Regions:
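Substrate-binding/active-site clefts of carbohydrate-active enzymes
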Residues: 172-196, 200-341, 351-354, 358-370, ...
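Conserved, mostly hydrophobic/aromatic
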Residues: 63, 112, 171, 212, ...
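Carbohydrate-binding surface patches
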Residues: 57-62, 67-69, 569-611
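The feature marks proteins involved in alpha-glucan
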Residues: 45-58, 92-170, 175-186
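Sec-dependent N-terminal signal peptides
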Residues: 29-37
């Protein structure tokens, strides 16, 4: 580009304006070189995101395909009629097919189709459609600026001093709002999360980030029959870059879902809460039912040796992040959501299907927008991906992807047992996982380079919720004991040095009636039981207090592997049901000189000697109770730790 600019400058200012043939030919040659260079640079810099650029005077189209023999965009007056205007596209040297439609096209709809192997493929919205009709069948031409709510230009991400300060709360829009006890008027809608009741609840709980299950346009819910209240988690991508109409108040208006999604994010930001989007780039709802499969057949997917679609997702296909243009698509897509919607983080579903280089490029691109935007995901796949294992973004290679996190199924399995059997975990009486609990507490196992890459959790939308998990592994225990196990397991997460993650509703003792895969179960199974706020107030208040304790003490959030190594030690007693975790020498780091956490995973009271705690101490948690201001103040040289409970002491 700089060379082209030099040529331009030279041609205009330094080639003499003479009539001699030699000078004129030189000028023409230089100008032609400039034009060629500028065209090449323009093609290289073309964004897939800019497939439809609207202005009141014209709309420009640019679609990528390396296989089409011809392409055309079909212009419709509305979302339903068949009559359309076909517009032929011209191919450039970088496989972008372009056309310009003059005049004000706002309110029109479009699809694109490609001709190859002697036939026209089915039409589809563009690969990067940003606004779509009901059920995402056609893309809409809109003015994105007109979808911005009042004050959108002043919207700011809430401050986040350090990534280990994060407490993520995962929920689904319907889970959080559909209950008659939720206090929400616009149930199941983006704008339901702009209302006072849910915002106040989240603020009071003390979480920093709200992770929402997929809310891009997905295919498993018919948006024309929303009155039937059908439910789905949403891991069925159709149009990656438009919100789903099922969460809008008018799915027939392409701008409505965009505006209301922005209103939701704006309201959460005003409440001091960041928003994480659950993204599913690893597969599509089906292949020929979406633009990726129709516009450029097979290119965006990995194939088996026999030409069939690989299936690392377990959903019938897996995408090919290692292919240059799908990698480009993924990078541009997350950046689009970060810029246009002010999204604060991305949770990558089945991240292990993607290659490591793509995740590194996503991280680098987001850093250019805002380095505090989060990236983490599931470091595994459902089945074996069709790509070299050592190059995939699997959990064990997390350290190769700086500042990309992965869920720690290690600490989950150690604390509550594996989701693939009904065995107990440490928090429910099985000491076998004690060493993995310790590794999880320091958030520096062999696979994570830094604590922030270790997502400490015990439950999420997948598998059993915590109440049901404890029920299937310890059915003979009383409810009082099960509640103690619940608190103990979550305490270990909240004092871990990693990034903490809570599944929404666990603090209200939610149950899914024993269903461990509620992806399409009805609201009655999935909703958060707000009516439990009174019945299980003790559990809710414990979660709230533990979040406050974590946020009050930097010792639980040291932030680097080096600091963890310097300040953390374990006291070994020979009792495998006891984990004693001490964070020492905290002067200048924490208000406490040291912190002591004792986790008792047995059914017996255990007396612990505390020779290290020589100063006056504050008892922050004990026997299923917690208070960031202290339950008791006294010097402690020994303490009794109740069954299935955590004791936390701060030494002043």
């Amino acid at each position: 580009m700089y060379f082209a600019t030099f040529i331009c400058t030279y041609a205009i200012f330094f080639v003499p304006l003479q009539s001699q043939t030699k000078s004129n030919n030189m000028r023409k040659t230089l100008i032609l070189m400039l034009c060629a260079a500028l065209v090449a640079c323009s093609a290289k810099q073309q964004k897939m995101e800019d497939e439809c650029l609207y202005s009141p005077s014209k709309t420009q189209f640019a679609f990528w395909s390396n296989a089409a023999e011809a392409m055309e965009v079909l212009i419709y007056d509305d979302a339903v009629t068949d009559q359309h205007l076909p517009l032929s596209l011209a191919k450039d040297s970088d496989n972008y097919w372009r056309a310009t439609l003059h005049g004000d096209m706002i309110g029109k709809y479009y699809t694109v189709r490609s001709f190859q192997n002697g036939e026209w493929a089915p039409e589809a919205p563009g690969i990067f459609a940003k606004a779509v009709s009901v059920n995402g069948q056609r893309a809409a031409i809109i003015d994105l600026k007109a979808t911005n709510p009042d004050g959108w230009d002043k919207d700011q991400r809430p401050a986040m001093p350090d990534r280990t300060d994060i407490v993520v709360y995962e929920t689904h829009l319907r889970d959080f709002t559909m209950s008659p006890y939720s206090g929400v008027t616009n149930k199941g809608k983006f704008i339901g999360l702009t209302e006072e009741a849910p915002l106040n609840y989240l603020k009071e709980l003390g979480i920093t980030h709200l992770q929402l299950l997929p809310f891009f346009d997905y295919g498993s819910i018919d948006e024309t029959t929303l009155d039937q209240n059908k439910y789905n988690w949403g891991y069925d991508p159709v149009n990656y870059n438009a919100p789903d109409g099922g969460y809008s108040t008018d799915p027939y208006d392409p701008a409505c879902r965009i505006r209301e999604a922005k209103q939701m994010i704006q309201a959460l930001h005003k409440a001091g809460i960041r928003v994480i989007m659950d993204v599913v780039y690893n597969h599509t709802y089906d292949v020929m039912g979406c633009a990726l499969g129709r516009v450029v057949p097979k290119y965006f997917y990995r194939l088996n040796a026999d030409g069939t679609y690989a299936n690392g997702s377990g959903c019938g296909n897996e995408t090919a992040s290692d292919h240059e243009m799908y990698r480009k698509f993924m990078v541009e897509s997350v950046c689009y959501w970060a810029r246009e919607y002010h999204i604060d983080g991305f949770r990558f579903d089945l991240m292990g299907i993607h290659d490591q280089e793509t995740m590194r490029q996503i991280r680098a691109a987001l850093d250019e927008i805002d380095p505090t935007i989060l990236t983490y995901g599931e470091g595994w796949a459902a089945m074996a991906p069709a790509y070299p294992y050592e190059e995939l973004a699997m959990k064990q290679w997390t350290y190769k992807m700086p500042r990309v996190g992965a869920f720690s199924d290690d600490i989950r399995n150690a604390l509550i047992g594996s989701p693939f059997d009904h065995e107990r975990g440490f928090a429910s009486g099985n000491p076998a996982g004690a060493k993995d609990v310790m590794r999880g507490l320091i958030a520096c196992p062999e696979w994570s380079g830094e604590p922030m890459q270790h997502v400490s959790y015990i439950t999420c939308h997948d598998n059993y919720c915590l109440r049901d998990r404890i029920e299937v592994s310890a059915p003979e225990e009383t409810e009082a004991t099960k509640l103690r196990m619940n608190k103990l397991a979550q305490t270990a997460v909240l004092v871990s040095q990693g990034m903490t993650f809570i599944y929404g509703g666990e603090e209200l003792y939610r149950t899914k009636q024993g269903i461990d895969n509620s992806y399409q179960s009805p609201d009655s199974i999935n909703i958060i039981p707000w009516e439990n706020r009174e019945k299980y107030a003790d559990l809710h208040d414990y979660y709230q207090a533990m979040i406050a304790i974590r946020r009050a003490h930097k010792g639980f959030r040291l932030g680097s592997a080096e600091a963890v190594k310097e300040h953390v030690e374990f006291v070994l007693t020979g009792n495998e049901s006891l984990v004693i975790y001490r964070i020492k020498d905290l002067e200048g780091i924490d208000t406490a000189k040291s912190l002591m956490v004792i986790l008792n995973g047995s059914a017996q009271t255990v007396t612990c000697d505390l020779p290290e705690m020589t100063g006056e101490c504050v008892l922050l948690a004990a026997d299923g109770q917690a208070n960031p201001d202290g339950l008791d103040f006294a010097p402690y040289d020994k303490i009794d730790v109740a069954p299935y409970s955590a004791t936390i002491i701060a030494e002043n």
